[in-house]
Amino acid sequence: MSQQKQQLTENQIIEHYKDLKSQQQQIISRISEFESDVGEYGLVINAIQNLESNRKCFRMVGGVLVERTVGEVLPQIKQNRDGIKEVVKKLDENLSIKTKELNDFVALYKIKITSQ
């Protein structure tokens, strides 16, 4: 690592730091979006779970409004919500890795953040 440390110029260090920080912010943004989606799915599930399973409902599929029953839609919505939760877990793991990478980089080059 010390050879790599010596090979990077100040501008390269700054750019690499900015890239790492940007990647971290992108992951945070995606987590936020997906958590919002999970919340919306939860609202829909709460709204329709007590309805009769043969009751008519509509769902947007690929930009087309499709008529289904609550019994058909509810399991699909729960499955989608659970899939999004898994994606959030993986993104949380990625965020932890990226944060550690960023902190290690800051420690290696003794970067001090000053507010502008």
UniProtKB/Swiss-Prot annotation:
Belongs to the prefoldin subunit beta family. Gene3D superfamilies: 1.10.287.370. One of its GO terms (molecular function) is protein folding chaperone. Binds specifically to cytosolic chaperonin (c-CPN) and transfers target proteins to it. Binds to nascent polypeptide chain and promotes folding in an environment in which there are many competing pathways for nonnative proteins. It comes from Dictyostelium discoideum. One of its GO terms (biological process) is protein folding. PANTHER family: PREFOLDIN SUBUNIT 2 (PTHR13303). Keywords: Chaperone. Heterohexamer of two PFD-alpha type and four PFD-beta type subunits. InterPro entries: PFD2, PFD_beta-like, Prefoldin. GO terms for cellular component: cytoplasm; prefoldin complex. The keyword Chaperone applies. It holds the Pfam family Prefoldin_2. Coiled coil: none annotated. This is Probable prefoldin subunit 2.
